[in-house]
Amino acid sequence: APACVGFQGMR
């Protein structure tokens, strides 16, 4: 699974 789906990669 991707690490930037809209919670951890948007930091």
UniProtKB/Swiss-Prot annotation:
Function: Myoactive peptide. Increases the amplitude and frequency of spontaneous contractions and tonus of hindgut muscle.
Domain of life: Eukaryota
Keywords: Amidation, Neuropeptide, Secreted
Cellular component annotations (GO), alphabetically ordered: extracellular region
Official protein name in the record: Tachykinin-related peptide 5
Record bears the keyword Secreted: yes
UniProt-annotated location(s): Secreted
Gene Ontology biological process: neuropeptide signaling pathway
Predominant cellular place of this UniProt entry's protein: secreted
Modified residues (Arginine amide): 11
